[in-house]
């Protein structure tokens, strides 16, 4: 309400993760050294604020966000959220860990559990391997989620395929 003057978000389009959506609302995020405009707000609303940033974003904003699992905000960096009707400073900025969304049904088929770590092989023209953690959620759409720094480092694009090495559970 403080930022947009209303209780709910305006639905814009669905996200791949079941029940989640991009809203029409955008805001500016500000740190001590800079700001980033037109940051899309995702719904549905939760009972906490979270801003997922990359390390490159941290440099631009002048913040030191910790790497955390989504929703785990202990030690999150302070960030100012600026909407059309006001602004608020909240401890909400994190660098999200690399994670693989998966439904409970698919997790059972693959023999993996929530928070389990695996090796992911990336076979682009700039190949490599990374470690990622499973995030088992109801209606989870099977998808690897990386920040822009990781994706750009491997020249990955949305909807590219990667290989999960289930033999190399960590």
Language-model features and meaning:
Residues 86-87, 123-127, 167-170:
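Short, charged beta-turn/beta-strand-edge "cap" motif at the junction between a beta-strand
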Residues 1-32, 37-115, 121, 131-161:
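Short beta-strand-centered segments at strand-helix junctions
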């Amino acid at each position: 309400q403080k930022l947009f003057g209303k209780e709910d978000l305006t639905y814009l389009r669905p996200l791949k993760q079941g029940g989640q959506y991009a809203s029409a609302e955008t805001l500016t995020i500000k740190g001590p050294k800079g700001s980033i405009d037109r940051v899309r707000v995702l719904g549905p609303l939760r009972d906490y604020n979270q801003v997922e940033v990359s390390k490159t974003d941290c440099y631009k904003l002048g913040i030191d966000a910790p790497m955390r699992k989504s929703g785990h905000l202990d030690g999150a960096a302070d960030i100012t959220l600026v909407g059309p009707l006001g602004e608020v400073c909240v401890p909400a900025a994190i660098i999200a860990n690399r994670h693989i969304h998966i439904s409970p049904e698919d997790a059972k088929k693959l023999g993996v559990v929530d928070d389990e770590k695996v090796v992911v092989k990336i076979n682009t023209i700039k190949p490599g391997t990374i470690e990622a953690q499973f995030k088992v959620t109801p209606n989870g759409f099977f998808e690897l989620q990386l920040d822009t720094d990781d994706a750009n480092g491997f020249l990955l694009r949305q909807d590219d395929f990667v290989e999960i090495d289930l033999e190399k559970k960590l």
